[in-house]
């Protein structure tokens, strides 16, 4: 085989490798696009910045926040606020990852079976939509954590584990202190939002790297 032919084959093979590298790169677009579902701990109450915004600033990811106050897997706020509805809206933005952070509003429902059903519905909806779902349990601001909140966290964890979905426990220990909460204890201060961002970013970095 002549030198010219060998040179042409080399160029073709080199072009193929480059094309494959480009194709592979397209499977992992950057920045990572993340949609967040949650309650007032995520939506914020008169905060300058909330943890999803801080996460975007600290990582360079594209983050959309769909959280609404008093929402949960069962709790529905003013109507249409529940996590299943938030997932619907989040999917319209076509994110790669949907992070669902459990809220404390579900703790007022005595039947945790409802929480399991709601959590399974939200998780399955994301999986069917083709996005990757990661679940963070509800957090709190003091110990001992009320049993009602622990029961909700355990129910969500059970659903996530059975569904093969990554779950981050935010109660052992609680991520917040009373000083990081508003005076009415309804949501985190800016300092509390930053504390939540620290925890979620560290965990999410490790998960998306897998």
For every predicted segment, state its role.
Residues 20, 26, 49, 151-153, ...:
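Residue-level detector of functional hotspots within protein domains
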Residues 31-36, 41-118:
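Conserved SGNH/GDSL esterase-like catalytic core that processes O-acyl groups on lipids
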């Amino acid at each position: 085989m002549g030198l010219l032919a060998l040179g042409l084959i080399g160029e073709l093979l080199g072009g193929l490798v480059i094309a494959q590298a480009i194709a592979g790169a397209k499977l992992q677009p950057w920045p990572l696009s993340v949609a967040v579902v949650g309650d007032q701990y995520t939506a914020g109450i008169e905060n300058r910045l909330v943890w999803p915004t801080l996460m975007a600033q600290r990582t360079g990811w594209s983050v959309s926040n769909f959280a609404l106050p008093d929402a949960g897997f069962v709790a529905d706020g003013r109507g249409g606020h529940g996590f299943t509805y938030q997932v619907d809206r989040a999917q319209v933005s076509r994110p790669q990852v949907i992070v669902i952070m459990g809220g404390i509003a579900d703790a007022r429902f005595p039947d945790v079976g409802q929480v399991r059903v709601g959590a399974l519905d939200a998780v399955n909806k994301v999986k069917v939509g083709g996005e990757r779902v990661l679940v963070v349990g509800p957090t709190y601001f003091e110990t001992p954590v009320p049993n009602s909140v622990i029961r909700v966290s355990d129910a969500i964890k059970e659903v996530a584990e059975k569904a093969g979905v990554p779950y981050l426990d935010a109660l052992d220990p609680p991520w917040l202190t009373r000083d990081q909460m508003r005076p009415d204890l309804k949501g985190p201060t800016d300092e509390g939002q930053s504390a939540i961002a620290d925890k979620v970013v560290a965990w999410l970095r490790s998960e998306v790297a897998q």
